[in-house]
């Protein structure tokens, strides 16, 4: 109603603005005040501050994203930043803060169902061919996998009867906890690999004791893309093992010829397929370094 949007930015860098504008027409501050518990005048004041600022930046965390409609929440914030032109300039941007210490590193390494490492599409034949060669495989599927919530739906639908969960606690963190717990209870077999007897581990048929951060060697990458080395301060207790060791031993028992002797060899393989790590070496581990490096750019 006050035309606070940045028309020049919208025209140059966005699509479907007319449809978005028409969609938002009925969402007045007065109407939204009933839903969010903030009066209309305050909503207008915040909108003016954000839109009129020379530079404005958004940060959000799990309170926004870990909902059954978390993706839509994030898309709304992205659209808001785009329509106000608060993207692509110093002091602007969007920063979805992760919930744990290495979500960025795990995502970089391919723990997203539609991507292989370094956000390379699993549907790209050239990408799959390269990874088939690196991993000595010939059967990487050309279809994206399932998200955590989709996995739980698939269990209820009878498409999944067994799961192997590493370092995750969906019985507590899933947006619909009851739905997730019912799914875990329906499984024929559940393996959980973790450092604690979590709510999810209570549903497990087999528990593999993993090691904590201070008990193992490896790297983590934060949201600022800093790759940092961790080294063990103490040995893992009891029968606990490092995650890479458990994975390799399971692979060997399944008949795979995996010969990794430690995280260093795993990191070397990652560098072969991830240009973001191109100029980062194990020898640089005395310092932290950010990716993508100058050479990778």
Region locations from a protein language model:
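Single conserved hydrophobic/aromatic residue that forms the stacking wall/gate
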Residues: 287-297
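Surface-exposed loop and adjacent secondary-structure segments within mature catalytic domains
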Residues: 102, 109-114, 118
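Disordered, low-complexity tails and leader-like regions
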Residues: 109-110, 126, 295
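Cofactor-pocket helix-loop regions in the catalytic cores of large enzyme subunits
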Residues: 1-102, 122-286
């Amino acid at each position: 109603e006050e035309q606070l949007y940045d028309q020049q930015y919208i025209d140059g860098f966005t699509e479907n603005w007319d449809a978005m504008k028409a969609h938002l027409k009925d969402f007045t501050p007065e109407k939204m005040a009933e839903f969010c518990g903030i009066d209309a005048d305050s909503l207008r004041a915040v909108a003016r501050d954000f839109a009129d600022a020379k530079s404005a930046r958004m940060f959000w965390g799990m309170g926004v994203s870990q909902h059954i409609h978390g993706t839509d929440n994030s898309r709304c914030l992205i659209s808001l930043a785009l329509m106000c032109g608060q993207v692509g300039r110093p002091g602007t941007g969007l920063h979805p803060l992760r919930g744990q210490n290495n979500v960025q590193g795990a995502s970089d390494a391919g723990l997203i169902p539609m991507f292989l490492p370094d956000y390379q599409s699993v549907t790209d034949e050239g990408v799959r061919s390269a990874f088939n060669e690196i991993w000595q495989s010939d059967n990487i599927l050309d279809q994206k996998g399932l998200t955590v919530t989709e996995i739980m739906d698939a269990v209820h639908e009878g498409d999944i009867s067994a799961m192997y969960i590493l370092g995750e606690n969906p019985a507590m963190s899933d947006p619909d906890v009851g739905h997730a717990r019912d799914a875990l209870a329906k499984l024929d077999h559940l393996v959980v690999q973790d450092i604690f007897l979590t709510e999810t581990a209570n549903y497990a048929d087999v528990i593999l004791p993993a090691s904590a951060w201070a008990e193992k060697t490896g790297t983590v990458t934060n949201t600022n893309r800093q790759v940092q080395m961790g080294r063990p301060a103490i040995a893992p207790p009891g029968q606990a093992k490092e995650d890479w060791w458990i994975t390799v031993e399971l692979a060997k028992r399944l008949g795979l010829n995996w010969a990794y002797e430690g995280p260093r060899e795993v990191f070397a393989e990652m560098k072969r397929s991830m240009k973001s790590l191109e100029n980062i070496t194990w020898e640089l581990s005395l310092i932290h370094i950010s990716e993508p490096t100058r050479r990778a750019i």
